[in-house]
UniProtKB/Swiss-Prot annotation:
Protein name: Protein AC11
Highest taxon above the source species: Viruses
Function in brief: Plays an essential role in nucleocapsid egress from the host nucleus to form the budded virion (BV). Does not participate in nucleocapsid formation.
InterPro entries, sorted: AcMNPV_AC11
A Pfam short name: AcMNPV_AC11
Amino acid sequence: MSLAAKLIIYNYYAKYNEVHDVYGESYHHYRIVQEYLSESYVNGMSCIERDVTAMRRLKSGSCTFDEAVKMIDAGDSIKSLSHWFSTSETMGIDDNVREVLEQIDAVVPVSVRVQNGWQIFSLNNFEREISQDMLDCLQIILGRFEYFMRNGKLLRIANVFNPNNDVVGWWYNKFCVVTYVHRIMYRSVPAELVPRLSEAVKKFIRLRKSDYDDRLHVDESYNCPRVIAEMYGRFCGIGKEHFSKHKLSCMHILFQYLRGKTTQEEKSFPCYRVIKDFGRQCKDVYKNLKDVFDLLHAHSMSDKDKNSLMDLLCVMDCEEIDVDCFYYIFESFLNNKHLQ
């Protein structure tokens, strides 16, 4: 089995969550968008899907490390390890992998290695000298990556942007619905619309008894794309022009908030507090990828585009947004006896 491929794979996955010099903790968001804009999908698969698939196949034994290297974007890992191979310098190499390289250095020093080439793949020429057991301690790296990906958030974002599958986003729908429910609750929609809109809310979202307090809480099963899409459609039908203007205003103010440019007039918008609560959780990812988000926002014409944009902005922090916005607002609305 290829020593070089093993090191490339382990270093790649070990550094997967490393904070990027330019894009911070949002580097994989950047990869997803660049892949989308350049239409550079490989066999219809996103970069994130390929990362996950390669890991799963390795763990199940259904592919070799050499095959896995060809599946992922391993260029940086190959470059860093090739630099080590020819110089013994370990810039761009994970600490755990570095410890293994130190053991290899002791067996096959750089002066010997460079006589066989300058690329990490030339390490395979020394498979007799280097025991495969040296790399056994790195197997845990794949498990750590699997654990990181367990919630499926990053893969979902990649699938939303990938035109080769039918996964669609839903956070634009959710943003518009939640902010509008806040306005319905505080009577900042046309009075003649309030009864029908209120009935729509009660039709789509239900409360249940809690196991830990006396208050009724939103049943989590209603917090899903299907229910939100149906409610969004109902609001479009009832609210018509008013809901349409609401959506435009909310998206404009959200991005004004993210840019730190909200005016006093915008701050007086009826649901500004809710918009701010959304934005507060999304500020870090926006800051890391400001140019990317501004570009997508400027070119998002359809609801599908806007849902993809908002998924990119919100999904990684969805639990916090749900607590601050979705559950709080719907429970406040549905527990309000004056709206029954």
